[in-house]
Amino acid sequence: MKTLRARFKKTELRLSPTDLGSCPPCGPCPIPKPAARGRRQSQDWGKSDERLLQAVENNDAPRVAALIARKGLVPTKLDPEGKSAFHLAAMRGAASCLEVMIAHGSNVMSADGAGYNALHLAAKYGHPQCLKQLLQASCVVDVVDSSGWTALHHAAAGGCLSCSEVLCSFKAHLNPQDRSGATPLIIAAQMCHTDLCRLLLQQGAAANDQDLQGRTALMLACEGASPETVEVLLQGGAQPGITDALGQDAAHYGALAGDKLILHLLQEAAQRPSPPSALTEDDSGEASSQNSMSSHGKQGAPKKRKAPPPPASIPMPDDRDAYEEIVRLRQERGRLLQKIRGLEQHKERRQQESPEASSLHILERQVQELQQLLVERQEEKESLGREVESLQSRLSLLENERENTSYDVTTLQDEEGELPDLPGAEVLLSRQLSPSAQEHLASLQEQVAVLTRQNQELMEKVQILENFEKDETQMEVEALAEVIPLALYDSLRAEFDQLRRQHAEALQALRQQETREVPREEGAACGESEVAGATATKNGPTHMELNGSVAPETKVNGAETIDEEAAGDETMEARTMEAEATGAEATGAEATGAKVTETKPTGAEVREMETTEEEANMETKPTGAQATDTETTGVEAMGVEATKTKAEEAEMQAYGVGAGQAEPPVTGTTNMEATGSRATGMESTGVSATGVENPGVEATVPGISAGPILHPGAAEASEKLQVELETRIRGLEEALRQREREAAAELEAALGKCEAAEAEAGRLRERVREAEGSGASGGGGGDTTQLRAALEQAREDLRDRDSRLRELEAASACLDEARASRLLAEEEARGLRAELAQREEARLEQSRELEVLREQLATARATGEQQRTAAAELGRARDAAEARVAELPAACEEARQGLAELREASEALRQSVVPASEHRRLQEEALELRGRAASLEQEVVATGKEAARLRAELERERVCSVALSEHERIVGTLQANVAQLEGQLEELGRRHEKTSAEVFQVQREALFMKSERHAAEAQLATAEQQLRGLRTEAERARQAQSRAQEALDKAKEKDKKITELSKEVFNLKEALKEQPAALATPEVEALRDQVKDLQQQLQEAARDHSSVVALYRSHLLYAIQGQMDEDVQRILSQILQMQRLQAQGR
């Protein structure tokens, strides 16, 4: 019963009609069904009233006071569901809000839509502070609801001791009766609230009041199997001799419950002297009025039959094991209820503190899906149980046939007069008992043997079932371990992070190399195009060629991209053969995740080529070799598994590396080899491994991916796994069919042997009769000897057939196990198919996302290339501008000289050559040129050696003279160039910022996807843990159900055997009465004692079974206090059906 968990609703503790319909058959339930809500539709219910209701829900007393004062709201106004803020405060225990509403003049006697007022709700949900406030506000303490219950009835049903004390302190009526005639003491006794019963009795409640069916509190306490409550009621003056309307007293209810301690208490109370007057405790006016009402109720209900006599012998228990077990169960129930309440309060606090997150909804959906899966598994297990029952029925038929055959043999033994197994059988035979007495004694012996054998068979079946359950749980654990390889994922993630770090270091080294090479490229402007072409030639194909658009340069590397898929398949086969041959290196020597080898005709050549290429890689490319060693070490750490598992790991590793390397942006250089940096492929095409002189290119080799490869081996591996599973399932089914055919053939052979044995037994019986007839006339010792020898031979044959039947039972058990294993294999196959489908979908989704990311990365790379080319052009323009700016000081000097000359000439030619306005304009331009020249001089100082070289050129050009118009033209051109350069620089800055933002966005999306994946893994782990918990709970429930079913079957069988034994004992007694007195030997007395012991054992077993059912029934009564979910209702309904079936069997 540990799986029965009562889940309470904090909002309303009221049973639904389905729960009330599943109550035990003990009469009408003491908890009244609430009246139907009228749903009073208030016409003026508005948003302000809803705000008031929400404030009470949040226990916000200042807001409640403000709303009532400002808006003039009425707290007792009912909403469309029939509840108000005033009643909600009493139900939730919001004492401060209730005090505010009472202070504003609320009607404390108003009822809600169900007919409850605030006093009833506060007592029902156990809020003594609210009760005290309402009673101090002149609320009537004994007001009844629509079912006739007072506040004390509700407090007694809920078991709230403090609420009952408050009501008693305000002089509440202690013995009010509801419509069914139940008093608070009767309800508290039925709910087994011992402390509450003690309080009511101390306050003066009538202990012997009866309801309309004539039941007292003592009867209901006995029915609930609560010895503590019975003891308190007996100490309070309860009389055990009172009978109900059916004439049953408390001892009858105690006998039905099967509690020995209760029967002992009742017996002690019956032995004590009764009080002189039964009405001494009813002297007060209240008690007399209640007794008069009880008497009227008893007169109105006619008695149908007299009370049956109490049990003839009430057992006196030597120990209190049963009582201690019940006390322990009650304490455990209290702890569980307290824990459930604490968890619910914690959950409500968390809901109030923060709203539910989306992950919680996802987890709830996963839990619901797991519960649905659990229900499906339960249905499959029930179908297995039905098949097991059918096999057990077949076995029972075989056992019946075997018993019939053994019965024929025993009758033959009885007719001959041999009793070899019982003590004193030879003495009885020598004294020549009558045939009827011998027959009865032999039948008793056979019954004892059958009972012993059945007990042994039941123990063997229980052992088989336990072994089957252990195997099932072990297979489930192994299946879970095969489905989700988390260690593989962690190792691949570590390798992916390491490759990403290496890629980042290579990019950083490349940038540093580019910054060091910038001055070299500025040395010769005419050779820039040649250097760029040489760099492109050395670095191999471009990024577009890496993504699959093949250029003629890709064929130089030794493997065309057209043959990528075929080469990938051959690589996988080579890795598989290499792993089978060596067993140490699982995935071969992979430099990166996407590596395509040259196409070879055989697998051996592929292995040799990979070995050669690995050695060349280790010699020529240290960075790639380091990556290879890291990956090989990471794969070898996981261990060498099966070939298919290795292939899947290799594919997943390649996929992970490809996805990881596709994210970072690529610099201006491209990869040297698109199909894997291998030295052998380079030598085959005439390209030397040492021909690459650019160290920046070598640094980028391990970080550049080979484009989008979708790994066709994953689908092939999944198909192979599915085909293998289907072949295994077919093989299991074929083996099961073969076993079934063999078992059927063996059963037919056993049936034929049984028929032959029956025919032989008939012949022997006829021969025995003939021998008896001949013995009666003249008798012959030789025939008797032959008959005995034939009987011995028949016994041997029957023993052989018995052993054969046992072998058949073992074979049937093996068949059951095989069928169960087949079903488990089918379940595993279905789970694996679903898992493969999910993995395939996830892989396709990830491949689509990877394609999108790669396209985005390709566009980003193209944009980056364009920006780099634009930056190179801008750099060249900047160099030209700097060169021109370096020429400005000489031009400025010349301008100064020209200005001086112009000043001199202006004095002479002021009227004829240059006007005054033009002179002022030239002076202003000269001033601007001076400021600009000063800034340019500062830049010239920073340039260093190049400025000195340019000054030398300027010195050579100073010899030439420049005219004024030429000077103005040069100045205008320089100004336009400077403005154009500034605009280009601003545009370049904007593009750089945009590119940086896009790169940052891509990185952030990658990190977000990583965090989401980790969260999904954590959620999957929690869901798996919850699934394991649900599976264990379902297994426990199934075990409890199977134990209860076995106990019920045993009880039925024992009842039948008891009836048969009683009949046989009766016949034996009759036969013994017919015998002379001299036959009463000690052996017969010993047999009688054995018969009595067997009967007593069977009676004790029946009583134990009835006590178990009564214990389940008491737990059902305890669960009435809370809301039961569907699982608990189903389990309790099964228990009730078992009890009804037992009653029908009796």
Curated annotation (Swiss-Prot):
It is found in: Cell membrane; Cell projection, Stereocilium. Residues 286-297 have a biased composition (Polar residues). Keywords: ANK repeat, Cell membrane, Cell projection, Coiled coil, Membrane, Repeat. InterPro entries: Ankyrin_rpt, Ankyrin_rpt-contain_sf, RAI14/UACA. GO terms for cellular component: plasma membrane; stereocilium. Its main location: membrane. Residues 320-517, 714-1110 form a coiled coil. It holds the Pfam family Ank. GO terms for molecular function: actin binding. Residues 272-320, 607-627, 766-785 are annotated as: Disordered. One of its GO terms (biological process) is auditory receptor cell stereocilium organization. ANK repeats lie at residues 81-110, 114-143, 147-176, 180-209, 213-242. Homodimer. Interacts (via C-terminal domain) with TRIOBP (via C-terminal domain) isoform 4; recruits TRIOBP isoform 4 to stereocilia rootlets. Component of the stereocilia rootlet in hair cells of inner ear. Bridges the apical plasma membrane with the lower rootlet and maintains normal distribution of TRIOBP, thereby reinforcing stereocilia insertion points and organizing rootlets for hearing with long-term resilience. This is Ankyrin repeat domain-containing protein 24.
